[in-house]
């Protein structure tokens, strides 16, 4: 009788161990799936890269939800900016924003030049230069006397026009941060300088540090899709004070502005 009780106790303990181990494995799987969810969420837009002709976006539709009014075909918003600290206590930030309205098939936006100071009282000096997209070329609408700046604007290329994320699924062991209350999700990957996108960025921008960047995939909003939230890519080459160097890219689809 005693042997039967001992055997029953042994079986109970064994079952408990199996259940606990299973729960732990389930949690691990759930955590792993969060990384996959982030990559799959980004893949919906990154699979389109490189978008060599931005006007192709007029024929592409993104995620739609109840925020869209009836008949609204939606608007694509693009942003690419490069920020770098060239002097102590300040960061130079330049880039372009473009709105491609699928209803009107017009694309307008602006190129911006900004200095960000540690002394926030100085942070009111952003300059904007209006642009439009015609035949896949940036057309400057404002008069710019600085010939170097004028050429930079007219020859500007968005990151989405030359980046390629065909290997996104192979990025592994990312550092995952989530906040379900906002909600927001972020995956960080340590890259190396042999990465094709990194090499392209080094060819285009004055990146002086030899350190390989960290790639951040950031989502604000429903990870499955939302026209209210946004997705942002960051290549952070340096976050050392007075050496900050970052490339930001943003491609999102949302309801059209009635005035656009």
From Swiss-Prot:
GO cellular component terms attached to this protein's record: plasma membrane
Keyword terms of this UniProt record: Cell membrane, Lipoprotein, Membrane, Palmitate, Signal
Which is one Pfam family of this protein?
Answer: DUF576
Please report the record's description of how this protein sits within the membrane. Answer: Lipid-anchor
Q: Tell me yes or no: is ATP-binding among this UniProt entry's keywords.
A: no
Lipid-acceptor residues (S-diacylglycerol cysteine): 23
Lineage top rank: taxon: Bacteria
Q: Where is the signal peptide?
A: 1-22
Q: Identify where the record puts lipid attachment of type N-palmitoyl cysteine.
A: 23
Q: Where are the transmembrane segments?
A: none
Asked if the record carries the keyword Cell membrane, the reply is yes
Location within or outside the cell: Cell membrane
Family under the similarity heading: Belongs to the staphylococcal tandem lipoprotein family.
Name of the protein in its database record: Uncharacterized lipoprotein SAR0438
């Amino acid at each position: 009788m005693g042997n039967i009780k001992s055997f029953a106790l042994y079986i109970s303990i064994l079952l408990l161990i199996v259940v606990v181990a299973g729960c732990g494995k389930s949690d691990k799987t759930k955590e792993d799936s969060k990384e996959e969810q982030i990559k799959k969420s980004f893949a919906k837009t990154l699979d389109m890269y490189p978008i060599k002709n931005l006007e192709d976006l007029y024929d592409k539709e993104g995620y739609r939800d109840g925020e869209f009014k009836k008949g609204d075909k939606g608007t694509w918003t693009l942003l690419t900016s490069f920020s770098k600290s060239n002097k102590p206590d300040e960061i130079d930030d330049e880039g372009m924003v473009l709105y491609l309205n699928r209803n009107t098939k017009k694309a307008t936006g602006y190129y911006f030049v900004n200095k960000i100071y540690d002394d926030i009282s100085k942070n009111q000096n952003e300059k904007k230069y209006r642009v439009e997209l015609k035949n896949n070329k940036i057309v400057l609408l404002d008069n710019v006397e600085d010939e170097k700046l004028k050429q930079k604007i007219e020859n500007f290329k968005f990151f989405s026009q030359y980046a390629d994320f065909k290997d996104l699924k192979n990025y592994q062991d990312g550092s995952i941060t989530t906040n379900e209350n906002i909600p927001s999700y972020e995956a960080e990957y340590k890259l190396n300088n042999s990465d094709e996108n990194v090499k392209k960025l080094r060819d285009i921008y004055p990146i002086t540090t030899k350190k390989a960047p960290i790639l951040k995939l950031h989502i604000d909003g429903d990870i499955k899709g939302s026209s209210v939230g946004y997705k942002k890519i960051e290549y952070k080459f340096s976050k050392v004070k007075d050496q900050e160097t970052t490339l930001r890219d943003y491609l999102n689809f949302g309801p059209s502005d009635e005035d656009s």
